[in-house]
């Protein structure tokens, strides 16, 4: 599969979909992801660490992803199983679907917070690995949020609010796993069986076609992979799915988690799969915390603060990628307070310094550093130095690319002088990085 692979092979049948990456996506810099489902009711996982930092032989039993609760609660000896037995008496997972009310959910309120970050696109989960769909998906026999639980078309509400807020709308769909459709044992190791049969491939195909028909998403964000039986061309194949998508949404994009088939951009996750963060268009995704789904065990020590998130955003953009930052809604539909605080902090920063990331590209001739923390981006003939250090800072410019007489902090000119192959600027104290901009001499 293409996910995390450094040299995936695009089969001949999928070469027809190769095209330049649309500028709206390339310049977006920031997208916001939302994970929300029945797993938001228990909202429980061990906050063990980031994907890529937790040993693989411990990952599944001690999974920090709360959205994996339906799997982790079935693993013998896992803390999630012990928690489930103690708190819920071993009740079936679908009890959480019926207990999920979304009583405080207002899509417009959520999107107002999202839009204030400056994000260019928004992607909610439509079906995660538990198989519950957040719209009235075909052949789900009522196991969806229209017939049970919230009794609402949550995807339709998200789509309308996203477009009203001026953002591009995407949909996440887990094609690689469905713990309800297929009666398979819990996943407790890499390489565990996953649904690959034709029945599931056609079921998933019909779901995504329905999402395209109803909501015209700008982004198809698949996960894990696609069932093997659906890869070869055919009437309900992934080839047909992509043909349908691009015919309806010509400037749409898809990620690389559809098996070894087609992608418009590569993805990494937390600190896993970072080898793909070169060359091609790419996107790093992670939660504000250690989980994508809301996890009641997470505290501020497990979450990105606003300054942390800003540094991550700038770092990703300075290397040519987009950041897809996730929030996990509470079961009620509220954004958790600590996650909201981070989003609001991002918005405050982008209101002042967003010109250094939105529509920006790397400036490879300038060198990043950790001391002081410094990243470089470029928009047109302007180069931006994003600095996280107060006081007098020396910005290395040995080749004289920058015109120091044009130094600006936002719209305000600032003093700058050249000395010993560097430009010296004075930076006021602040909680988050600042962007100093220069006209390039090239």
Where do the model's predicted regions map?
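Mature catalytic domains of secreted/periplasmic carbohydrate-active enzymes
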Residues: 2-442
């Amino acid at each position: 599969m293409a996910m995390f692979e450094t040299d995936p092979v695009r089969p001949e049948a999928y070469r027809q979909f190769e095209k330049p990456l649309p500028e709206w996506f390339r310049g977006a810099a920031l997208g916001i992801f939302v994970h929300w489902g029945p797993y938001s009711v228990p909202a429980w996982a061990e906050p063990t660490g980031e994907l890529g930092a937790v040993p693989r032989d411990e990952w599944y039993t001690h999974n920090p992803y709360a959205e994996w609760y339906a799997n982790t609660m079935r693993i013998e000896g896992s803390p999630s199983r012990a928690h489930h037995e103690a708190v819920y008496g071993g009740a079936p997972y679908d009890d959480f679907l019926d207990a999920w009310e979304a009583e405080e959910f207002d899509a417009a309120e959520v999107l107002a917070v999202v839009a204030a970050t400056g994000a260019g696109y928004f992607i909610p989960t439509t079906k995660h690995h538990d198989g519950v769909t957040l719209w009235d998906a075909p052949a789900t026999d009522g196991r969806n949020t229209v017939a049970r639980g919230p009794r609402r078309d949550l995807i339709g509400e998200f789509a309308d609010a996203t477009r009203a807020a001026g953002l591009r709308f995407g949909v996440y769909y887990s094609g690689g796993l469905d713990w309800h459709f297929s009666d398979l044992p819990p996943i407790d190791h890499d390489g565990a069986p996953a649904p690959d049969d034709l029945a599931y491939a056609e079921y998933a195909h019909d779901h995504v076609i329905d999402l395209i028909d109803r909501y015209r998403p700008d982004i198809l964000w698949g996960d894990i992979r696609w069932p093997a039986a659906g890869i070869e061309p055919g009437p309900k194949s992934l080839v047909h799915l992509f043909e349908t998508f691009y015919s309806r949404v010509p400037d749409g994009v898809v990620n690389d988690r559809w098996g070894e088939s087609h992608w418009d951009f590569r993805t990494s996750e937390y600190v896993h799969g970072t080898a793909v963060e070169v060359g091609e268009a790419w996107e790093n995704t992670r939660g504000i915390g250690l989980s994508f789904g809301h996890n009641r065990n997470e505290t501020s020590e497990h979450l990105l603060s606003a300054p942390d998130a800003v540094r991550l955003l700038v770092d990703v953009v300075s290397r040519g990628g987009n950041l897809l930052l996730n929030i996990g809604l509470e079961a009620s539909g509220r954004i958790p307070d600590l996650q909201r605080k981070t989003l609001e902090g991002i918005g405050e920063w982008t209101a002042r310094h967003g010109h250094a990331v939105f529509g920006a590209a790397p400036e490879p001739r300038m060198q990043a550093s950790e001391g002081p923390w410094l990243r470089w981006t470029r928009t047109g003939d302007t180069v931006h130095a994003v600095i996280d250090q107060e006081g007098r800072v020396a910005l290395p410019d040995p080749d004289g690319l920058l015109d120091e007489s044009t130094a600006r902090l936002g719209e305000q000119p600032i003093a700058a002088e050249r000395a010993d192959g560097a430009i010296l600027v004075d930076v006021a104290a602040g909680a988050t990085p600042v962007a100093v901009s220069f006209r390039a001499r090239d």
